[in-house]
Amino acid sequence: MRVADFSFELPDSLIARHPLAERHGSRLLVLDGPTGALAHRQFPDLLDYLRPGDLMVFNNTRVIPARLFGQKASGGKLEVLVERVLDSHRVLAHVRASKAPKVGAVILIDGGGEAEMVARHDTLFELRFTEEVLPLLDRVGHMPLPPYIDRPDEGADRERYQTVYAQRAGAVAAPTAGLHFDEALLEKIADKGVERAFVTLHVGAGTFQPVRVDKIEDHHMHKEWLEVGQDVVDAIEACRARGGRVIAVGTTSVRSLESAARDGVLKAFSGDTDIFIYPGRPFHVVDCLVTNFHLPESTLLMLVSAFAGYPETMAAYAAAVEHGYRFFSYGDAMFITRNPAPRGPEDQA
């Protein structure tokens, strides 16, 4: 299976660089995986596709203002993008500078703050700050907008590049399917008899890294930390018992649940995952998916293709482009029912 199979033409004008005025104001492309049928709706119409007894699983990670600007004490500007918070004072981070800082180098943070480079781990730098990391980031950090948004972060991004139910700080990218939900819509979903549960997956900057191999089977995913609690396992078992569907809000929720069920049995799990879901891999937990539109040749598009079927997914994306849907993090959304017999690129006639 080749990465190029997942390419498609996307006009630059369809990349959403700012959020809409209202979270729920986006459009919703509904894809019935078993038939490939499409319906063009508005996001609040998601209610029409939910049933009493269903369970929606959300990712409650909270995006941290992970981008810092500063300079080495010896001179030279640099940019720091925190990848993972290790403890109250230490992080793993990407550092962009004309010359990489050496062990022992001191970094002076714009706005106040100081860190020392204490170790290097492949492409990541371990930094130790002189004050607690999370309060420092809240004070002087910038929201880590994806590279395709291609603009400086603004004050509004602190609210809008964050779900309304975000709780556990640690992500450097938003679980963007959740950005469409406001409190009023969540209340209507609950009123319909739909249950909810929360997993945590701290999305890393690697989610934006391109696939650099020709065959997708040769690709190795970056690691991200997740937690699926026993309460989630119990909620899913109860959902199954009453005949409900498990609806994942976002690919991060899918990856969390399927990581916790890698042997086919869902169990509570806390730790790193590098799960890579592409056509041919079975799903053990998720029945339906709410997700945004993803980048060409991305691992997330491959995940959607595994869920809905490759020809159905690529046809849906072609329809989305034709109808002017907005793409990527601040863009529109899809609601997908899983295809029980998905085909891959090699199965095309």
Swiss-Prot record:
GO terms for biological process: queuosine biosynthetic process; tRNA wobble guanine modification. It comes from the Bacteria. One of its GO terms (cellular component) is cytoplasm. The keyword DNA repair does not apply. Its EC number is 2.4.99.17. One of its GO terms (molecular function) is S-adenosylmethionine:tRNA ribosyltransferase-isomerase activity. It is an enzyme of class 2 (transferase). Pathway: tRNA modification; tRNA-queuosine biosynthesis. It is found in: Cytoplasm. Keywords: Cytoplasm, Queuosine biosynthesis, S-adenosyl-L-methionine, Transferase. It catalyses: 7-aminomethyl-7-carbaguanosine(34) in tRNA + S-adenosyl-L-methionine = epoxyqueuosine(34) in tRNA + adenine + L-methionine + 2 H(+). It holds the Pfam family Queuosine_synth. Its main location: cytoplasm. Monomer. Belongs to the QueA family. Transfers and isomerizes the ribose moiety from AdoMet to the 7-aminomethyl group of 7-deazaguanine (preQ1-tRNA) to give epoxyqueuosine (oQ-tRNA). This is S-adenosylmethionine:tRNA ribosyltransferase-isomerase. It comes from Pseudomonas putida (strain ATCC 47054 / DSM 6125 / CFBP 8728 / NCIMB 11950 / KT2440).
